[in-house]
Structures are given as C-alpha cells and as structure tokens.
C-alpha cells in the first residue's frame, strides 16, 4: 500500500443546481445541496478510496461541521491526525451555481484563515512526511508553504505533485513548478501558464512540453471531452489518452479525482498511459454522480 501525504484546504460546498437554463435576472428554481469539498480534502478522499494510505495535512473549524469532515475522511480510511482544529476560520465555504446540464456557471469562495493554515501546515509537515512515498499539494497555498514543501521534498527525496485548486498563486510564481516532479492542469490553466492556445491534441502536447521545459518534468494537460495528454521529459515520452462520453451530472471534483487516480497509479510504478487511463475512468464516475469525489460504491465500475 502506498503512503501519500496530501496537503490542502477543506471547504464545505453549497451547490445550487437549476432545473432549467439559468437566467441571471430571474429566480431560478432548483435544488440546493451541502457537501464536504476542497481540493486537498477531495484528493485525500479519492486516494484513500483507491486503497492508498493517506495522511492529510490541513485545518478545520472546531465545530460540528469540522468534526463531520474529519469523520467522513476517517470512514474512507484517511489518517487525519495531522489536521489541526481551529476555533474559527479553519475551513472555507464554496457556493457554486450549476446549470441544468450540471456544468459550473459561477461560484463564490470564502477562504480559510491563510496565516493559521500556513502555520499548521509548516508544523505538521515536519512529522507527516516521514516515511511517505509521495506528496500531493494544492497549489492554492501560500508561497511560503510551497517553497517549504519543495525544500522538504528535495531533502527527503520525495516526489512532489501539484494540483490546481486555483491558479492565482502559481500564475504569479511560475518558477515554483521547477520544484515539482509532476503537475496536472486543465486546458484553460495550461493556456494561461504558457500564453499559448490549445485547440487540438497536438497543441496540447506542445503546450505540455513547453510547461515541462520550464517546470515539472512530468506534465499533464486535461482536455475534457478530448481526454488528456502527458509529457515526461525524464523518459522523453509523450502521449494522449482519450475518454468516453458520459452524461454530466455534476462536474465538481472531476479534476481532483483525475489527479488522484493518476498519482495513485504512478506511485505504484504504473506507466503514464495506464495512469491517465485510470484517471479518465475515475473522473467519468465522479462526473456522472452528485459526489465531489470517488466513493467505495464506484470501485466496481473501474475494473
């Protein structure tokens, strides 16, 4: 069983899904649901359900909701001993508005206390990284945290993989990607980071290669219905993996689930192509459900 440390934020997601096409100047009748989310938390859940030994490093608020977040993660098998409980602002909230096709149209994000989260991660990472096989980190954290984890992983010779919860920090500090083993992003994120346009699969491979030259040697770009591409400059290989069309119920968490499956396979020394294939399967299961991530009931469909 692989041991993977996951570092990132916890959010409580509030999703409103319209029953009909959205109209910004009218009342939209629909459904509203509450669920636990956040890129770091989602990745921790996905990796645990896939059978990895997960150590989650984060903060939650010391209230009923925060306790519920931890209980849910523990039920999936994740270790939450390195999650610190704060009296206030230990986690964020995400308000999402989905259209009747299940696609995200707009959102508002309330962030957890950045300084307290940073302090907790710096404290806990000293102990939590001992004995792990790999580290996954949400890139929507402070530069101080990212630099510290890059330093620790280099010192401990641990592979470090980054996933974009939000692009703002890494967009302003693109040089930090040089400290990562692997980086996975969407087509839109890749276009912003590379200042290049992606229309075809060939475009995506070119952009992934340009990003890999300046950043993580293993770079993946996801392209929704066109699948995903990868470039691995360590082995001078690249490729494309397609995906099957699925009915979208809720696209939230699809990127996190794809990232998790790819990382899970890579830490088991599977090939990049095998990793991306599982990533596509897992993402498809999540997209076709109302879940933010993989749950045990979905595992049979991955066989």
Swiss-Prot record:
It comes from the Bacteria. Its cofactor is Mg(2+). This is Guanosine-inosine kinase. It comes from Exiguobacterium acetylicum (Brevibacterium acetylicum). It is an enzyme of class 2 (transferase). Pathway: Purine metabolism; IMP biosynthesis via salvage pathway; IMP from inosine: step 1/1; Purine metabolism; GMP biosynthesis via salvage pathway. Keywords: ATP-binding, Kinase, Magnesium, Nucleotide-binding, Purine salvage, Transferase. Coiled coil: none annotated. Homodimer.
